[in-house]
From Swiss-Prot:
SMART domains: WD40. It comes from Pongo abelii (Sumatran orangutan). SUPFAM superfamilies: Nucleoporin domain, WD40 repeat-like. The modification Phosphoserine is found at S1077, S1079. This is WD repeat-containing protein 72. Keywords: Biomineralization, Cytoplasmic vesicle, Phosphoprotein, Repeat, WD repeat. Its main location: cytoplasm. It is found in: Cytoplasmic vesicle. WD repeats lie at residues 15-54, 60-102, 158-196, 315-359, 399-438, 456-501, 504-549, 552-591. The gene is WDR72.
Length: 1098
């Protein structure tokens, strides 16, 4: 699993919808957590002054969130658990926003209680769950596996609500109320052993409460006697000893109660569905206990409520509220009532310690203490919340933002295509658009970045599709767009011409899909158009014709499948029915429902089902947190309805599509528009492109040292002269641009027969392996060098804490990276199904940040402390590799960027690595050789490349310098301290940059800051000398790694090479032969290396 996906959110000026369905305050009273109908969780900062600010959105559920609860002892592990309507459960670390565990069970939970008895239980405790199933489930809080269940001996039923009775005087018990109004009690303390032994555990007591629709049950911990039970139309107070009724209060004015809490002895708080709340004092009635009722029992002392206070609330009966109460156990010991609305608003009331009524006895009104919405964050930080195409689009609505209704990113062309509400389509370079949006000097990027505007639609553009991204056999210039008027246009995006218009005569086109490669009709793949009126149309692009119009579906289309043998189109609908269409004739062959429909769909399950077929990088296919929002408006690309699944060529894409270091994800917030875009930086892939391949990772079945020698062989074939540059120091590292130059990777190895031939004047190499019948070569991978290095610089610009000190100018001068316009919203893909994004103004409640670092791109105050600890661990001689005084500044700049990215990857991998694995990896790295007095930059980067390969592949064969062992231990410890990945990365980056800038004080620097206009030309001029350095480093790699059989004196070269030396170098690929040795994978070495290596051989 790739864990190096960093993200930057470009939100736009309108906040995404967040319809609150669940709310809680964490035990440390520093954070509010809300779950939404859209499936996302939101973390809100809560200050000691009870000020609120939205901090982070967590993407992990594909359905509406039903409940939230703590999942650990919060003082030890800040974990909470969330449950969704479709049975998904996630355990989150709310400190760093990462999902630590996820499971999907066939249960819909409506309430969860955490229980742990330290002296009787092992593990992390239990999650006691109730919902739309019988009785109570017991789920392991760590693994989310079902451990056992509490069963009912009589009248098993669904459970509406529950609470845990925990007291030092009595045993722990679980109290529940069923949908039929049955109160049941299970003993927890005495049931632990029985549950661990999988024995049935039944209730010890039950009582019918004579009311329905129970909302809340609460035990009074102050008196350990009263029991509050809130129903929708009344609330009651019982004596916990024998469950006798003490009080009944019926709702008035048509209000429906939603919950309640015991806030003090004989004092309760009740709230309603429309957000009103009331505080009552329970008073004794004064009835004598000597009065006996007719049945002979002793009459219990009865009580009656006295209304003390009520809370002020805006009258809005159309917005249901979810509410809760928190009694702070830490200073300043606030009692807080909180609510969340479907509109996304959070409101807090500070409940006084001693609520009192007015002098005339009427209830006193408690004012609202704080209220906040996501939009408030966006309004206060409008510069942070700009859209990615604001600089390029002249299309503005009243709010000043581009009205984008659909969006598509083409990684192979680095083009972002945005369809707008007025029918125009904007095409721009995505990386340039991101730089213009985020970096200072964006106007220069805007002026130098061409963009196109396509005009052809008369209605809003609702869907886009780039067919070549799904099948390389289709024309690279084709693009499809659909609109509200049921018109689909085939474009040539290079010439901006309209090739054809398809008029479907149906509803708005909500999704454009493509058949898999195995399904072809008339020699070509088919385009499937799904419309909002439940109709489906098939288009033949080559023939410019519409093959099928299927209009008889009664429910929204949920699934599209293809039958390649009989040319059938299989359409699955939301009611689980199936329609089978014959494509050639356009007739409906069959219509099935129920079990037959499920069988038909399962029989066609031979290819991958996905939510969307839009061409995105494979890592974004793995991180499906945004694609798979089945019941929410958060979807990647326009989908026809929640949960649409199509059988497509994405299985083929997964095999053919190579991950790229930079991607753009459009995220839908409504069916008709794109709310924001996410920039994805694949740190692992970026390091792969920039670091040299470690020699230990070279497959013996491949040609000599892979792609670099292939390139050299090609240059020999083309009769290009190879030159070596004279240098006093050891050969330097590969430059970033040179390494990122487009090359073709060798085919995938394994049990296949791999042959490589490069023929010129008899030059031929061949390596044979075990023969296999099936051969699936790895796809060719071409990466633009300038795009790679620009991506690396933009990534570093986004992470550097600009404005912390006076090093900004030095970073711009020596690293040639531009400063950010302001703080940005960072994010992280923590798991294959989970994603977290910071919101604009996430640090509003952090008074220290506002006071000391206002407007600084500092992730948290903790970053500076972590950076100091990291710097203290660094030995004096360890830092960014130097020794490049004789090289041009552009090469030093590239080497520094390579080194910084490799360090960031190391940090990212270690922080995400499990502790036991990190310890095992750390113990496997030991000192293998004595450091030279003068450290070579090439050796540093090769060491990092070797260690990177170990972390990526899980091997323990590589070695790092001893100095890195202490850093490895330090970074591994950060995981246990709930340090966020972005915090750790920013801290290490800042420490390394500071070390580098300090070292530059001893090195003469002749470079000047490069302007944006000169940046591109400068990088192009640097390519040629860096290619020469690549040759030099390759020979240095051989010298450092492969010991010679016989000592050979170094050969000195003049700057003017004679013809004999040139001929030797031209013939060198012919001599780069790995002969079979007695030890598998161990090459024999030849003395010819010394003839071409300008460095001293030791």
């Amino acid at each position: 699993m790739r864990t190096s996906l960093q993200a930057v959110a470009l939100w736009g000026q309108k906040a995404p919808p967040h319809s609150i369905t669940a709310i809680m305050i964490t035990d440390d009273q520093r954070m509010i957590v809300t779950g939404s109908q859209e499936g996302q969780l939101c973390l809100w900062n809560l200050s000691h002054e009870l000020k609120i600010s939205a901090k982070e959105l967590l993407f992990g559920h594909s359905a509406s969130v039903t409940c939230l609860a703590r999942a650990r002892d919060f003082s030890k592990q800040p974990y909470i658990v969330s449950a969704a309507e479709n049975g998904e459960m996630c355990v989150w670390n709310v400190t760093n926003g990462q999902c630590v565990e996820k499971a999907t069970l066939p249960y819909r939970h409506t309430a969860i209680c955490y229980y742990h008895c330290s002296f009787r239980m092992t593990g992390e405790g239990w999650l006691l769950c109730c919902g739309e199933y019988q009785d109570v489930l017991i789920i392991d809080a760590k693994t989310l596996a079902v451990v056992h269940s509490f069963r009912s001996s009589q009248f098993p039923d669904w459970i509406n609500c529950m609470c845990i009775v925990h007291s030092m005087r009595i045993q722990d018990s679980l109290l529940v109320v069923s949908v039929a109004g049955e109160l049941k009690v299970w003993d927890l303390s005495s049931s632990i052993n029985s549950i661990q032994e999988k024995q049935d555990v039944y209730e010890k007591e039950s009582k019918f409460l004579e009311s329905l629709n129970c909302q809340t049950i609460r035990f009074c911990t102050y008196t350990e006697r009263l029991l509050l039970v809130v129903f929708s139309k009344c609330w009651k107070v019982y004596d916990y000893c024998d469950f006798s009724l003490l009080l009944t209060e019926v709702s008035r004015n048509g209000q429906f109660f939603a919950g309640g809490e015991v806030i003090a002895a004989h004092r309760i708080l009740i709230w309603t569905e429309d957000g009103h709340s009331y505080i009552y004092q329970l008073l004794n009635s004064g009835l004598s206990k000597s009065i006996y009722p007719a049945d002979g029992r002793v009459l219990k002392e009865t009580i009656y409520p006295h209304l003390l206070c009520s809370t002020s609330v805006q009258e809005n009966k159309n917005r249901p509220f979810v509410m809760g109460y928190m009694n702070e156990r830490k200073e300043p010991f606030y009692k807080v009532l909180f609510s969340g609305e479907v509109s996304g608003r959070i409101t807090l009331w500070h409940i006084p310690d001693v609520p009192v009524s007015k002098f005339d006895g009427s209830p006193r009104e408690i004012p609202v203490t704080a209220t906040w919405t996501l939009q408030d964050n966006f309004d206060k930080h409008d510069t942070v919340s700009q859209s990615i195409i604001d600089y390029f689009s002249g299309l503005k609505d009243g709010a000043g933002t581009a009205v984008v209704t659909s969006s598509e990113y083409i990684p192979s062309l680095d083009k972002l295509i945005c369809g707008c509400e007025d029918g125009t389509i904007i095409i721009t370079q995505a990386l340039n658009a991101a730089k213009a949006r985020l970096l200072e000097g964006g106007s220069l990027v805007k002026d130098s970045s061409p963009h196109k505007v396509l005009k052809g639609h008369h209605q809003s553009v609702t869907s886009l599709l780039y067919p070549h991204g799904l099948s390389s056999k289709l024309d690279q210039s084709w693009m499809l767009s659909g609109d509200l008027d049921s018109c689909v246009i085939l474009w040539d995006i290079f010439t901006e011409e309209i090739l054809h218009k398809f008029f479907l005569e149906a509803g708005p086109v909500t999704s454009l899909l493509m058949s898999p490669e195995k399904f072809k009709l008339r020699g070509a793949q088919i385009i499937c158009c799904v419309c909002s009126d439940h109709s489906v149309a098939l288009l033949h692009l080559e023939g410019r014709s519409c093959l099928l119009r299927a209009r008889k579906h009664l429910f929204p289309v949920k699934m599209i499948k293809w039958h390649p043998v009989e040319n059938f189109l299989i359409v699955g609908c939301a009611d689980d029915s199936v329609y089978i269409w014959e494509i050639e004739t356009g007739t409906l062959e069959r219509h099935e429902t129920g079990e037959r429909a499920r069988i038909i769909l399962n029989c066609c399950d031979d290819s991958q089902l996905v939510k969307s077929v839009f061409p995105i990088a494979s890592e974004t296919l793995k991180h499906k947190s945004i694609e798979q929002r089945s019941s929410s408006p958060y979807q990647l690309g326009p989908l026809p309805c929640p949960g649409l699944q199509v059988e497509s060529s994405c299985k083929v894409i997964d095999a053919k599509f190579c991950p790229r270091p930079f991607n753009v994800l459009p995220v839908k917030t409504k069916w008709s528009n794109v709310g924001f875009h996410i920039l994805l930086f694949d740190l692992e892939n970026l390091v792969e492109l920039l670091l040299p391949t470690p020699l230990s990772d070279v497959d013996s079945s491949s040609s000599f040292y892979g792609g670099e020698v292939l390139r050299r062989a090609k240059s020999t074939v083309e009769k290009k002269t190879l030159t070596l540059r004279k240098s006093k120091t050891a050969c330097g590292p590969l430059s970033a641009e040179a390494l990122a130059k487009p090359i073709t990777e060798s085919p995938a190895q394994g049990d296949n027969t791999i042959k490589f031939s490069a023929e010129n004047d008899g030059i031929k190499r061949q390596k044979k392996m075990k023969i296999s019948k099936k051969m699936q070569p790895k796809p060719s991978r071409k990466v633009d060098a300038s795009l790679t290095i620009d991506t690396a610089k933009l990534f570093l610009s986004c992470l550097l804490p600009w404005g912390v000190d006076d090093l900004d100018y030095l970073c711009i001068k020596h690293l040639n990276i531009l400063k950010l316009q302001g703080p940005i919203s960072l994010g992280f893909a923590s798991n294959e199904d989970n994603f977290s994004l910071m919101l604009p103004g996430w640090d509003l409640c952090n008074t220290e940040m506002i006071k000391d670092y206002s407007g600084v791109n500092l992730f948290s105050r903790k970053v500076l402390d972590l950076s100091d600890k990291y710097t203290a661990t660094l030995p004096n001689q360890v830092g960014i590799p130097r020794g490049l005084e004789n090289n041009c500044d552009s090469l030093q700049e590239s080497d520094t960027i390579v080194y910084l990215l490799s360090r960031l990857f190391l940090v990212n991998k270690l922080v995400n690595m499990p502790l036991e694995l990190a310890c095992r990896v750390g113990s496997s790295f030991r000192m293998e050789c004595v450091h030279n007095k003068v450290r070579s930059a090439g050796n540093d980067i090769l060491n990092m490349s070797s260690f990177y390969s170990c972390l990526r592949n899980g091997k323990n064969e590589s070695h790092v310098p001893e100095a890195d062992l202490s850093l490895l231990k330090l970074i591994s410890c950060w995981r246990d301290q709930s340090v966020q990945v972005t915090e750790a990365i920013q801290a290490v980056l800042w420490a390394e940059v500071q070390q580098h800038m300090k070292s530059l004080g001893k090195i003469p620097v002749n470079s000047q800051p490069v302007s944006m206009a000169e940046n591109g030309n400068c990088e192009m001029k640097q390519m040629l000398p860096k290619l020469e350095w690549t040759e030099e480093l390759e020979l240095q790699c051989i010298r450092n790694t492969l010991p010679l059989q016989t000592p050979v004196s170094p050969v000195k070269h003049d700057s003017n090479l004679n013809s004999a030396n040139i001929q030797d170098m031209e013939d060198m690929p012919d001599r780069c032969v790995l002969e079979e040795s007695e030890s598998p994978g161990e090459p024999r070495h030849h003395s010819w290396i010394a003839k071409v290596c300008p460095c001293k051989v030791s």
